[in-house]
Amino acid sequence: MSSSQNNNSSWIDWFLGIKGNQFLCRVPTDYVQDTFNQMGLEYFSEILDVILKPVIDSSSGLLYGDEKKWYGMIHARYIRSERGLIAMHRKYMRGDFGSCPNISCDRQNTLPVGLSAVWGKSTVKIHCPRCKSNFHPKSDTQLDGAMFGPSFPDIFFSLLPNLTSPLDDPRT
């Protein structure tokens, strides 16, 4: 932890503040603490204590290890909930995830996508809803793609279909 780190910060505050983690949204404490949302995640009681502490304790031995994966998997679940979709919608509308590099997409906003739901398989990509292509993000991020999963853009746009228009068909 840097000496400039606020002593009242939680692990979540610290983690979300790391350069490259701007694609992530804050998962509310009540969502994190709900045991239903923790099902299937290992070491949840120990990690929960670390990520929810008001002060980061670097002597815990867990710092930035299993917490990153655990928070990432909770995040993947959260962004599929109503509150999570609202948070990601806000980020999408602000253009936080970047825009499509395809010139015919006219700087269409993109969404983060994972090529796999399995941790450690690939880093996050950005998905353009107009051309349906995935690209490497311009931002300096090494987030695991499982933090979003391969179905997130489909879920997002099936619930919010008016956010994009398809590419013009040159045959019409």
UniProtKB/Swiss-Prot annotation:
GO terms for molecular function: protein kinase regulator activity. Disulfide bonds: none annotated. Gene3D superfamilies: 2.20.25.20, protein kinase ck2 holoenzyme, chain C, domain 1 (1.10.1820.10). Induction: In wild-type flies, it is strongly down-regulated by double-stranded RNA (dsRNA) interference mediated by Su(Ste) transcripts. In males lacking the Y chromosome, the absence of Su(Ste) locus, relieves such down-regulation, explaining why it is strongly expressed. Probably not expressed in wild-type flies. In males lacking the Y chromosome, it is testis-specific and constitutes the main component of star-shaped crystals. Belongs to the casein kinase 2 subunit beta family. There are multiple copies of the stellate gene in fruit fly, encoding proteins that are extremely similar, which makes their individual characterization difficult. Thus, most experiments probably do not discriminate between the different members. This is Stellate protein CG33237. The lineage of its organism: Eukaryota, Metazoa, Ecdysozoa, Arthropoda, Hexapoda.
